Amino acid sequence: MSPWQPLLLVLLALGYSFAAPHQRQPTYVVFPRDLKTSNLTDTQLAEDYLYRYGYTRAAQMMGEKQSLRPALLMLQKQLSLPQTGELDSETLKAIRSPRCGVPDVGKFQTFDGDLKWHHHNITYWIQSYTEDLPRDVIDDSFARAFAVWSAVTPLTFTRVYGLEADIVIQFGVAEHGDGYPFDGKDGLLAHAFPPGPGIQGDAHFDDDELWSLGKGAVVPTYFGNANGAPCHFPFTFEGRSYLSCTTDGRNDGKPWCGTTADYDTDRKYGFCPSENLYTEHGNGDGKPCVFPFIFEGHSYSACTTKGRSDGYRWCATTANYDQDKADGFCPTRADVTVTGGNSAGEMCVFPFVFLGKQYSTCTSEGRSDGRLWCATTSNFDADKKWGFCPDQGYSLFLVAAHEFGHALGLDHSSVPEALMYPMYHYHEDSPLHEDDIKGIHHLYGRGSKPDPRPPATTAAEPQPTAPPTMCSTAPPMAYPTGGPTVAPTGAPSPGPTGPPTAGPSEAPTESSTPDDNPCNVDVFDAIADIQGALHFFKDGRYWKFSNHGGNQLQGPFLIARTWPAFPSKLNSAFEDPQPKKIFFFLWAQMWVYTGQSVLGPRSLDKLGLGSEVTLVTGLLPRRGGKALLISRERIWKFDLKSQKVDPQSVTRLDNEFSGVPWNSHNVFQYQDKAYFCHDKYFWRVSFHNRVNQVDHVAYVTYDLLQCP
């Protein structure tokens, strides 16, 4: 096998002709690419498969006659199937499953020549994106996929921005420039090249697939009372199940969704990306569409592609575009963006007419396989424009972790539970199997960090998908009023506390238990740089760590003894080094310590933040007495002297810091680099040539605290 041949993760697309009833006569809907194997018998399908993946050729080289049996035996052995030599149901099922497209070499194997990287700091560049997921979800998925391998090896993975990267990541369709074309929906999922210069080491993903986190379309939410949590599909509202966002229960036309499985019980919701909520790009300052609007003398009551050659949907943000020239692009939503059909990438239009009947949701009518589809115009009967509604999709994280294993030099495993097993299968557990670890140790040796489980993610980041090559803009901060039924509840309050009666003092706690060791802490309440030392806060205590003059760890200390006016827990802390002010945040309240005096608690709305802001994730210092105040996925400029935010400065987190988790629970700056913490991990951001770049993803305890 040539080392230049890519590893192709393949799902054999089985096509069918599907019938729709119409006056007792079936109406056939012809689906592009569905007919690739529709006329093949099981034997013909097996012959094609065995030839494509090298089994037939290998059997011939062993002197076997033209017979399926020897090749089937080899296939069944490689895939750990019962070795019958027959084309039985289990073998056919495997043939129809997602898998890599090169000959299988066996477990613990690497490419011919034992190809590997000969340096340990591997760089990668995300050259292009899919519109199926928000960009920071994609960035996070790739970072977590690399973390799978860095956790068990001495390798580190650094994101860069340019072709000099060792691993270049891109999304493409069909023939995308490397001589190994993708073949549409449910065909080749991805491929990667073995380590080496040029195209070697690169990983490509088929953009005709639906990329998700493995549980269906990812739709972020805004506002509502779910703090930006993604939609949960299906969700129940008034006893009815919904597979996509809906306007039911509202009279303003703004689509919404439940963020748990049962809105009727949990009352958690958010608003879905919609032109009735905001627009992207353009010159309309993110304002929502105004319908109807006038363009070239014609009236439009919905987003349109008129006047554009690129197919992007847009609208005017005033009633008369001809007069005001104010416009924006209409957001897309993964839950109604179709795949396949003859309108891939377009959005379902509801309601639509099919065989004279009106449909307000995706339907399986007219199909014998039960797959859900929709029209992308209001009348399928007239326009014949359609596509498949989103399914569960493929986990970008899992596929990327598999592909990056190939990019590091690993071939396939014959252990079905291994990440490097040829077939795709979704699971939520730690993806690495002992088989994978043995293989990567064979190439690069052991790592120093335990627990190879990668950081978890909460499924989606609350940003809409942006068209490629365009920078995203923030939605307007004028909030919709009211939910489908009830208003959100407020954040918990810690209760008032009095000013300190004495100056801060520091003394370690008297007892010594395993809990006194910060290396035993899974997730800290907050981390902050105070007086040049990192302070790690947890459950009313804190530790100080400094690497000046060697690594020095002190504590634990009692928060109540050092800062008597403060509650025992906090969400974030920040020191303004010039006047030596320390800001503490707990939910919707803030305290400021200056020497021996304290100001607070003050509510966050006194800072100029809206009442919907109930958490400060952290502050990052900037010049001129300013800071960036971060609350989950949003950022404001904050004046440290007046202690006010600039309400016009609000923007999305990914506009400033691409690639960090939107749901970081703590953000701080240390030694001129920003740290975004999620779970037990941190994403480190360096500031280089005015570009904020994630340069390291690692463990808080092992890498920051230097725990053994």
Swiss-Prot record:
Binding of Ca(2+) 1, residues: D132, D207, E209
Cofactor details (free text): Binds 2 Zn(2+) ions per subunit.
Compositionally biased region (Pro residues): 491-502
Keywords: Calcium, Collagen degradation, Disulfide bond, Extracellular matrix, Glycoprotein, Hydrolase, Metal-binding, Metalloprotease, Protease, Repeat, Secreted, Signal, Zinc, Zymogen
Pfam families in the record: fn2 (PF00040), Hemopexin (PF00045), Peptidase_M10 (PF00413), PT (PF04886)
Record-linked InterPro entries: FN_type2_dom, FN_type2_sf, Hemopexin-like_dom, Hemopexin-like_dom_sf, Hemopexin-like_repeat, Hemopexin_CS, Kringle-like, M10A_MMP
Keyword Zinc appears in the UniProt entry: yes
Annotated region described as Disordered, given as residue ranges: 441-520
One MF term in the entry's GO annotations: metalloendopeptidase activity
Compartment annotation: Secreted, Extracellular space, Extracellular matrix
One CC-aspect GO term: extracellular matrix of synaptic cleft
Binding site for Zn(2+) 2: C100, H402, H406, H412
Record's catalysed reaction(s): Cleavage of gelatin types I and V and collagen types IV and V
Biased composition, class Low complexity, residue ranges: 480-490
Motif extent (Cysteine switch): 98-105
Binding site for Zn(2+) 1: H176, D178, H191, H204
Entry binding sites for Ca(2+) 3: D183, G184, D186, L188, D206, E209
Alphabetical list of SUPFAM superfamilies matching this protein: Hemopexin-like domain (SSF50923), Kringle-like (SSF57440), Metalloproteases ('zincins'), catalytic domain (SSF55486), PGBD-like (SSF47090)
The protein's required cofactors: Zn(2+); Ca(2+)
Pro-piece positions: 20-107
Start and stop residues of the Hemopexin repeats: 521-566, 567-611, 613-660, 661-707
Family: Belongs to the peptidase M10A family.
Notes on the domains: The conserved cysteine present in the cysteine-switch motif binds the catalytic zinc ion, thus inhibiting the enzyme. The dissociation of the cysteine from the zinc ion upon the activation-peptide release activates the enzyme.
Function field: Matrix metalloproteinase that plays an essential role in local proteolysis of the extracellular matrix and in leukocyte migration. Could play a role in bone osteoclastic resorption. Cleaves KiSS1 at a Gly-|-Leu bond. Cleaves NINJ1 to generate the Secreted ninjurin-1 form. Cleaves type IV and type V collagen into large C-terminal three quarter fragments and shorter N-terminal one quarter fragments. Degrades fibronectin but not laminin or Pz-peptide.
Official protein name in the record: Matrix metalloproteinase-9
Species for this entry: Rattus norvegicus (Rat)
UniProt gene name: Mmp9
